[in-house]
Amino acid sequence: MLLEEVRAGDRLSGAAARGDVQEVRRLLHRELVHPDALNRFGKTALQVMMFGSTAIALELLKQGASPNVQDTSGTSPVHDAARTGFLDTLKVLVEHGADVNVPDGTGALPIHLAVQEGHTAVVSFLAAESDLHRRDARGLTPLELALQRGAQDLVDILQGHMVAPL
């Protein structure tokens, strides 16, 4: 990778992390920085963006950023959005093709992370799209994780979306 490409990736990632929509647009449209340019840490702007900024996500995705990019631990932007509870960002990612059934390095789907953190609205959104029979590295399904946490509201949501496996 060329030093110029890394510097461009650093600038784009920095602007995305700060939530600076104008700078992200300038870099993408005027300087023609590729939306999946890697920064010096091997991450894209979508991976390091300020998750509360759906405008950043939209701009990057409209310019061709991959919604399914994973870091070395297997974490993708949908994992991060689910874990941190940013439903609006998660919806934007899914609308642009993010796969909610790709596990991270621990075998967890985004819904496992949302259950673990107690993000009810995120669990409700993901339940219809997720493989609820998928087990994480500890062998737990999202429902079993909710039961283990004693989170009855999440248990109710998940049970409402359960379909018997074939």
From Swiss-Prot:
ANK repeats lie at residues 41-69, 73-102, 106-135, 138-166. Belongs to the CDKN2 cyclin-dependent kinase inhibitor family. The modification N-acetylmethionine is found at M1. InterPro entries: Ank_Repeat/CDKN_Inhibitor (IPR050776), Ankyrin_rpt (IPR002110), Ankyrin_rpt-contain_sf (IPR036770). Interacts with CDK6. It comes from the Eukaryota. This is Cyclin-dependent kinase 4 inhibitor D. It holds the Pfam family Ank_2. GO terms for biological process: autophagic cell death; DNA synthesis involved in DNA repair; negative regulation of cell growth; negative regulation of cell population proliferation; negative regulation of G1/S transition of mitotic cell cycle; negative regulation of intrinsic apoptotic signaling pathway in response to DNA damage; regulation of G1/S transition of mitotic cell cycle; response to retinoic acid. One of its GO terms (cellular component) is nucleus. Its main location: nucleus. The gene is CDKN2D. Interacts strongly with CDK4 and CDK6 and inhibits them. Keywords: Acetylation, ANK repeat, Cell cycle, Cytoplasm, Nucleus, Repeat, Tumor suppressor. GO terms for molecular function: cyclin-dependent protein serine/threonine kinase inhibitor activity; protein kinase binding.
